[in-house]
């Protein structure tokens, strides 16, 4: 019996929450993509305009085909938005989030001109690390899995064979000694800590072993042994100690994607020594004695650490030896964890495909310098992201999703499905060209008209200087305006967009930050200054994407300020006009009256964790707005963690839960912030 609002399809493990039936072009798009996959097409393109419900279409295709899926987005902000939406559509299935877990990342580098070596430095976001581990666990355990990720998925994460071979399967009644369980946990990179019980740790009290799985957000496992036999397995809350569920069986997954069996490490040590001998011989023959001394000293230290501890700092640079791969072979990535029949969706593909192709070259240039000057062995070059052709060789059946497909999608797609008609009946905005020499004064007048109707305005300029000057000019004339620029971090950017929707201010000025995936139904006017200056920011695709920001409003309008009409402008205006004509015709044929979008304003990462709540018990907490840098946030996180544990020790569980919720809110704020 399916719950109300849920839809199931024959042979599919997914339960799709569908509060409304597909409408507009959605039914035809869903049918076309499903048929294309069934026909064995490798590449398809969903050409979906802004606001046409592309995510809903993707969700329907996944649910109907019943296969695991990987959805790639060009950045963490859009990945979080997609993740939240997919969680809404599939609340009963495994929707996972796989992005870079670095809050801060400074790669190892050498600058020969200054003889400057820069050590690797990074800060790992534990919450995202837990979500990455949860993603691979779901792929190995269940078919109803959807992973939402970024280009982080083409970076090496450890061999899936080694990872799967290291799991610890526990069943009630199994014969296993306490010593064997502890040895297996240590080999899986869990740490024993009887005092501070956190994710990736275990503690021992007599015959009872508590394990906090690395991929679990909130529940731990209690294993009770009697006479070298598993007596009970229980899931419990680590904070309160309350038992939630008794289990007949539990699988403990490794504490890291990079776990390696001991025999593999010993084998790798021998091959690293062999490569070191070859490299020393090369440097000596070339008279590079400094480089020879440098590589010998660094590598021998790493070998000693591997021998004694099983890992070393920068172990990823020896990944080729640990995986047993041949020189030049690509590293194992998340894509190797996907089943052969999985689906792939590349959202905003005109941007994402370019990123997939560009990651390898930048990484290679930096590492070649390290190898040349004796900081790393040549095998370090194989610790790298996939090249585009390697990614293509590993791709599953794929759908490119974009309002403006690029040349790559056009050349590869066997089937192009258009989704131009919106379910709401909204049509693409009218596009108007006005003279550039009076653009600022004209824009001010237009802004006042829109503000009087309580609507919002987006303005895009060509340079940072012009954005700043325009923002100052508008502010001097009484306009509530903000400026969005590249120095603003991800979380603050999300808050600015949220404030625009809430009406804290009316006009947002930016350069290249107003294009893909910004969902702002309140925006009725998009103004593009200097639209006739040909280049990346005024290309056909950029113009169509920017014009599309006004397509979610009933009174959507776009003004291009230009003294001449360029080829890019002409093509963008023709395409917008074609779509608008098709939409108006569809509305007329079906008697549809366009209606505006009323979308609740919510935190972008809603659904990643429970919504934050306020509690009187935390009156001393620092307001989120006051935490402007990483150090302040780190201090507040430590303070809240200590407060939570103090309350728990004193059996003040309500206050402990309040501190935990405040901690969750703060970690949510940090969640989107990262490098890749």
Curated annotation (Swiss-Prot):
ATP binds at residues 48-55. It is found in: Cytoplasm. One of its GO terms (cellular component) is excinuclease repair complex. Residues 35-192 form the Helicase ATP-binding domain. GO terms for molecular function: ATP binding; ATP hydrolysis activity; DNA binding; excinuclease ABC activity; helicase activity. Forms a heterotetramer with UvrA during the search for lesions. Interacts with UvrC in an incision complex. This is UvrABC system protein B.
